[in-house]
């Protein structure tokens, strides 16, 4: 078992959702925190909540898609705390898309730059410090869509499958080199976060046309799928970290889908299409939104 008390933990995407819940859960367990997010307002709110518990906390506005910025941040955290034990690469975006054939390259680039490259940037920047701690742990947040593909989610699924592959490779390399760094990949199912609504808001800011069907589909997806409270998701993740698990499934939906994918690899795509079509029928079924 791993003890989190007195560990220095870095959490990206800490402004809301799972990231905020992780920050508060880590604070409850006695960690010292370095929190980052591109959303300065939400990040400040999280910092206030954490500080109210008496926890030592440092925060920074951070765009994880910017490699130089992330490398600078890693140095700042190490200089401030003197050591870094845990890294939670949680920052991510949904990125509303259509079919792969119809999705613009800019959508692929935007989603991959945050969801995949953000994880690579964070891991590469902090890994030397984690090794130096003698008791390091990398925790990368993938998704249910890191082992189950969904039509209409090409960029998102690509990014989350990539996080899974990268993390599993890193785990093997740390074991091969006998490095003091544990590596965990997390697959959340439907967590009640703001990721779907945020994707709509970001699309509006970019001037994209938002149809009523798309708005209704997002609302229905939130209602049908995004049910697990982020606080519960964070507790599952932190319990898994404490138990040194290399793979953490968050929610019954993630566990069931994982089982279906492994037992029915040839049939799960058809099952996925049928289930989503039935559940999302009232709002249209051209595309769906990510699970977590």
Residue ranges and their predicted role:
Residues 143:
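Residue(s) in the substrate-gating loop at a strand-loop-helix junction
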Residues 98-100, 104-109:
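Substrate-binding pocket helix/loop in short-chain dehydrogenase/reductase
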Residues 123, 159:
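Active-site helix of classical SDR
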Residues 2-33:
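Canonical Rossmann dinucleotide-binding motif of NAD(H)/NADP(H)-dependent dehydrogenases/reductases
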Residues 53-56, 76-89, 96:
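A glycine-rich helix->loop->beta "capping" turn
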Residues 176-252:
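SDR active-site lid
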Residues 40-41, 61-72, 105:
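The beta1-alpha1 cofactor-binding region of Rossmann-like NAD(H)/NADP(H)-dependent oxidoreductases
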């Amino acid at each position: 078992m791993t003890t989190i008390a007195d560990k220095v933990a870095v959490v990206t995407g800490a402004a809301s959702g799972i990231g905020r819940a992780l920050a508060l859960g880590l604070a409850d367990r006695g960690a010292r925190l370095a929190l980052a997010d591109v959303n300065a307002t939400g990040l400040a709110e999280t910092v206030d909540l954490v500080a109210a518990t008496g926890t030592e906390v440092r925060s920074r506005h951070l765009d994880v898609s910017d490699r130089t910025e992330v490398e600078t941040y890693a140095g700042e955290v190490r200089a401030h705390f003197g050591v870094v034990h845990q890294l939670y690469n949680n920052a991510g975006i949904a990125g509303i898309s259509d079919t792969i054939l119809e999705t613009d390259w800019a959508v692929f680039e935007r989603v991959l730059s945050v969801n995949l490259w953000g994880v690579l940037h964070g891991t590469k920047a902090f890994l030397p410090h984690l090794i130096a701690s003698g008791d390091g742990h990398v925790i990368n947040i993938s998704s249910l869509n890191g082992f189950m593909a969904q039509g209409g989610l090409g960029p998102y699924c690509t990014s989350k499958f990539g996080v899974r592959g990268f993390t599993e490779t890193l785990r093997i390399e740390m074991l091969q080199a006998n490095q003091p760094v544990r590596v965990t990949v997390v697959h959340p199912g439907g967590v009640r976060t703001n990721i779907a609504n945020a994707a709509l808001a970001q699309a509006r800011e970019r001037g994209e046309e938002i149809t009523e069907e798309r708005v209704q589909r997002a609302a229905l997806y939130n209602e049908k799928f995004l049910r697990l409270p982020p606080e519960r998701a964070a507790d599952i993740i932190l319990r898994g970290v404490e138990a040194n698990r290399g793979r953490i499934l968050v929610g019954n939906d993630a566990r069931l889908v994982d089982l279906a994918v492994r037992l029915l690899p040839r049939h799960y795509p058809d099952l996925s299409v049928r289930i989503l079509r039935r559940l999302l029928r009232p709002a249209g079924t051209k595309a769906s939104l990510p699970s977590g």
